[in-house]
Design a protein with these regions (language model features):
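Juxtamembrane helix-loop-helix junctions in multi-pass membrane proteins
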Residues: 1, 13, 128-158, 215-216
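Alpha-helical transmembrane segments of compact multi-pass small-molecule transporters, enriched
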Residues: 1-5, 57-71, 155-159, 220-234, ...
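Structural motif at transmembrane-helix junctions in multi-pass transporters
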Residues: 40-57, 141-147, 203-223
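Hydrophobic/small/kink-forming positions within alpha-helical transmembrane segments
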Residues: 4, 31-36, 62-67, 130, ...
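Membrane-interface interhelical linkers
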Residues: 1-29, 39-49, 97-120, 157-193, ...
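Loop-to-transmembrane alpha-helix entry segments
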Residues: 21, 58, 74-94, 98-104, ...
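Hydrophobic residues within alpha-helical transmembrane segments
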Residues: 1, 25, 29, 60, ...
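Hydrophobic/aromatic residues within transmembrane alpha-helices
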Residues: 45, 71-77, 139, 148, ...
């Protein structure tokens, strides 16, 4: 509801009325590719490979998004953009693997079949996440980010909430199972994170995808592991070793290539 309120305050009812069947279709597909199939596939991949490995593989999705943009949107992808995309992806994947090694996370104990299945699921996740960025680009043109996210979150909440309720009715929780909903004080602790990530972050994401070529916007939007490094260092949880520094340099070099392309 917050998205629609801000949309009406900033653009009136006309901003919401700009939704067309074309945009609704593409934005619905983006929900399927992200909150629907994409996140579900990632969950099952992480169960088989471990979260860091699954995330590293899924993080190649900017390559697919760049390909989609070049083939269907006529975006020009020169050598410098392609190099920048590959450097960003390589740097992010390297950082994720370094984080996994530092924490001792490994999927070696899993059977070979489970690891292969996890690999395929992680690759499918990368395609779904690329489909999300592509769908937002196709469906979000001409709309404000608040309208785009208002529709996406409303649809996702309705569908996922209904599925959860059906499952809850079929399989009621036992007396010793943890409750889904937290107390009011616990919920209030999440308010800053919700406003920062779900509202501000997702609005910036939509604006970037609809105002910049996918070959530039998608790699730059996928660099959260890079920004996690200084946070980890400041909190004293992660040392800055040579390998991590090299991974940062590779990622930043990719950013420079994309920005100056």
């Amino acid at each position: 509801p917050l998205f629609f309120v801000v949309a009406m305050l900033s653009g009136g009812l006309a901003s919401i009325g700009a939704l067309t069947l074309h945009s609704v279709g593409w934005l619905s597909l983006s929900v399927v590719c992200s909150y629907g199939l994409g996140d579900m596939l990632f969950y099952h991949a992480a169960m088989r490979l471990g979260t860091p490995t699954a995330l590293a593989i899924a993080s190649i999705y900017p390559l697919w998004a760049t390909l989609f943009g070049a083939l269907t949107l006529g975006e020009h992808v020169g050598g410098q953009r392609l190099l920048g995309t590959m450097l960003c992806v390589a740097g992010v994947v390297w950082l994720v693997f370094l984080q996994a090694a530092a924490k001792g996370d490994s999927a070696d104990a899993q059977p070979k079949r489970h690891r292969l299945t996890g690999l395929l699921l992680a690759l499918l996740t990368s395609l779904m996440w690329a489909g999300n960025t592509y769908s937002v680009r196709r469906g979000g043109i001409g709309l404000t980010p608040f309208v785009v996210n208002g529709f996406r979150y409303l649809l996702a909440s309705t569908v996922l909430g209904s599925l959860w309720l059906i499952r809850r009715l079929k399989h009621p929780p036992g007396p010793n199972e943890p409750q889904l909903f937290c107390s009011k004080p616990d919920l209030l602790r999440f308010v800053p994170a919700v406003i920062t990530e779900a509202f501000i972050g997702s609005s910036i994401f939509v604006y970037a995808m609809t105002h910049t070529d996918l070959s530039i916007a998608t790699p730059l939007a996928a660099m959260s592991p890079l920004f996690a490094v200084p946070v980890g260092i400041l909190l004293g949880g992660e040392p800055l070793d040579v390998r991590r520094l090299l991974a940062i340099i590779v990622t930043v070099a990719g950013v420079v290539c994309l920005v100056t392309a």
